Amino acid sequence: MVDDRQTAAPAAIRLLVIQFGDYRQALWAREHQQPETYRAQYYSMACFEKLLQRGQGLIVCLDTEPYEETWHNFRLVGGRFIPRGGGWGYLRHVWLASRRLIQLAETFAPTHLIIRTPAWPLLMVGRWALRQQIPVLPLFADYFYTGTLKTRLKNLPLIRLLNHPAIPLVANHNYPACASMVQAGVAAAKVVPYDWPASRHPREMPAKDLARSGGPYRLCYAGQLSHPKGVGDLLKAVALLHRAGPEVDLDLFGDGPDRAELQELARRLGLDDRVRFHGLTANEKVLAAMRAAQLVVVPSRHQYPEGIPCVIYEALEVRTPVVLSDHPSFRPKFQPGQGCLMFRAGDAAQLAHRLREALTQPELYGHLSQGTAAAWEAIQCPVTFGQLLDDWVAYTQGQGELTCRQFTLALGQPAVLASPGAPA
């Protein structure tokens, strides 16, 4: 992949972005020279700012405390747009939130729309934008499930929208998530995998061995604290090791909807002195914890609709082996024994067994750490987030073809996207 922030800025646009996360908080942290909370956070913000050097932006954050602020040429809006619960209350909340989003869009009058979630905001605001002939870029990091007839029927309106001829490009994070979209019915010729530019390479660090300092082995988890992410399964696996060995400590970085329940579960399992809940933590500190740990664990259950999370890249970059669930986003790209071990999602006993395997066999552990470089290489994508944005905006302004479409799932998996002006 290439550095994509050095190309010329496009003509002035009015860009509406609808997403999760708290853009205002991220801006505050960056302005106060705080380290970013997650991988490529400030990079992605810089990509939007580059597009809008001569334009205006409206960033709507879907699940924050309500606020409306202005920052330079950006208007920032946060709110509780995401409904809780179900039934008629859910439908009413969706209807009211959709009206609010469309009102914001009508007032702002965007020339371009990026929606970073495949949920109802894409259906409601995306349809409105297509009626107004506004270019729409669906930009995801989500796995699409197609297992049941009910799920397929539920997805039909979304698939029809994504296949609309006025949407030439649909992007998702890495190949497995893109393949899931194609399996769900999105035309392969418009599905492009993207990634963040690599900021470090595993070979910049030495591989690790299982040297013991005398204390417990250290496990690390970074991500949302929720049951669908498998954190409860991880706690139960640690409890099994606590009883049968080897001795381990667990560091949990992040926050989430089930944090209080998980803290209570850790207490009930007798893990108060073995598990530390650190909350949201600067990315550089999480990386240091991953390097210091013997294993990084990514126990996501199948129901959690993610691509390949950044924590996997980061663990491999610091040469720490990863213990992964068999999530459908992970299976196609990871080979057990090459930088990782794999267990059945939701199976705490098998997770404990995999952890014990890695922590009691020094030769296996050394082989896994050596394999992190090859595992990292296997999950690289040819198109970066910034290249994707630049390419799409230039295309909508009649300044060229969609170069990134040479990497759609209909055409295989080439190595890298050529720099602007370079031979393809």
Describe the predicted segments one by one.
Residues Q263-T281:
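Nucleotide-activated donor-binding/catalytic signature segment of Leloir-type glycosyltransferases, i.e.
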Residues R54, E363-V416:
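A charged, aromatic-enriched C-terminal amphipathic alpha-helix characteristic of glycosyltransferases
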Residues R291-P305, T320:
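Acidic donor-binding loop of glycosyltransferase active sites
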Residues I134-L153, P165-L169:
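A short, histidine- and acid-enriched strand-loop-helix "catalytic/donor-clamping" loop
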Residues P336-G337, L341-A348, E357-E363:
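Conserved acidic donor-binding segment of nucleotide-sugar-dependent glycosyltransferases
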Residues E317, P321-L324:
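Short hydrophobic beta-strand element within catalytic cores of glycosyltransferases
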Residues P165-G214:
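Donor nucleotide-sugar binding/catalytic pocket of nucleotide-sugar-dependent glycosyltransferases
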Residues I18, L210-K229, L235-V238, D251:
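Conserved donor-binding/catalytic core segment of Leloir-type glycosyltransferases
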